[in-house]
Every structure is written in C-alpha cells, then in structure tokens.
Design a protein with these regions (language model features):
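Cysteine-centric segments in proteins
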Residues: 1-95
Length: 95
C-alpha cells in the first residue's frame, strides 16, 4: 500500500472495441489484452469522471467482465493531437 492507504497499481493500456450512440455516448464492448486475450464486456454498470475513483483525469467505467466488477479507464489525449481521441487502460496491482 502507498502512503494514502491505496494499493499500489500500474496502468496497463488495452485495446477496447466501443460503440457510439446517436448522442455521442461511448459504450465499451470488448477488451483485448496485449497478449491477445479478449473479454466481452457484459454490462456497463456506471460511468463517472475518473477523479471520483482515482486521482487522475479522464473517465471511469464500472464494467462487468466474466461476472466480476472491474474499473475501465478512458484517458483523454492531449488536444494538440486531434487525430488521437484517447486510450483505454485498467489498473493492475503491483507488489
């Protein structure tokens, strides 16, 4: 644990297939890890600014994967690079 009492984690960037609805809402559908493992997202249970969960800018989706609740983060890109909208990551516990 770190000084704030939180478990030590690191960002692991993942590929996420998403849909956008007519209002512009981004709905993540599937996660693919770097080694090729793919997991469908069964349900999006919540969506909020990430700083309500962790001290970071961006968005946090609470999703169900294989019956377990997980956090999936969307990190917005620097506005100086308009062709890059952002990227997805999960937090993985470290020792």
């Amino acid at each position: 644990m770190n000084r704030k009492g939180r478990r030590k984690t690191e960002k692991v960037y993942v590929k996420v297939n998403s849909d956008f609805d007519a209002t512009g809402y981004m709905q993540p559908r599937q996660i693919t890890w770097g080694d090729g493992r793919t997991y469908p997202i069964e349900q999006v249970r919540d969506f909020r600014p990430a700083n309500t969960i962790a001290d970071m800018p961006g968005d946090c989706y609470t999703v169900m994967i294989k019956g377990q609740e997980r956090y999936l983060f969307f990190e917005r890109s620097d506005p100086r690079f308009p062709s890059r909208f952002g990227r997805w990551f999960v937090e993985v516990e470290t020792k």
